[in-house]
Amino acid sequence: MSKSLIVYGSTTGNTETAAEYVAEAFENKEIDVELKNVTDVSVADLGNGYDIVLFGCSTWGEEEIELQDDFIPLYDSLENADLKGKKVSVFGCGDSDYTYFCGAVDAIEEKLEKMGAVVIGDSLKIDGDPERDEIVSWGSGIADKI
């Protein structure tokens, strides 16, 4: 059985809800899921026997890209994670009225690619409140690529 880790940072609860929907999609595909708030994860956990690691982070800020506050320490130390060759995927919530819609998703994905991680599927950028069907469908597509 494949094993996955979903790490999320959430301020208003939207990204946490999205992470739960992704977990639901993975469980429907009989993939073992660990769902963790970013505050409960260290970089050492990320390469720890998982077939895929998913990162969920909301975007804040109007003038520049701002990651969700709790996610920043993990993002800043991500280079220390053993993710070379590891399958990863990224999702997040944002607001398309802002200049950098879901910029955190792009920033995380770019950093992971530079580290040699293998990004599978397109990232998911959620505009506003998460919609279950859209997210479960995306998660199922990612799960099929493991």
UniProtKB/Swiss-Prot annotation:
CC cofactor: FMN
Function: Low-potential electron donor to a number of redox enzymes.
Protein keywords: Electron transport, Flavoprotein, FMN, Transport
Protein name, as recorded: Flavodoxin
Residue span, Flavodoxin-like domain: 4-143
GO function term, MF aspect, one: electron transfer activity
Pfam families assigned: Flavodoxin_1 (PF00258)
Keyword Mitochondrion: no
Family note: Belongs to the flavodoxin family.
InterPro entries in alphabetical order: Flav_short, Flavdoxin-like, Flavodoxin, Flavodoxin/NO_synth, Flavodoxin_CS, Flavoprotein-like_sf
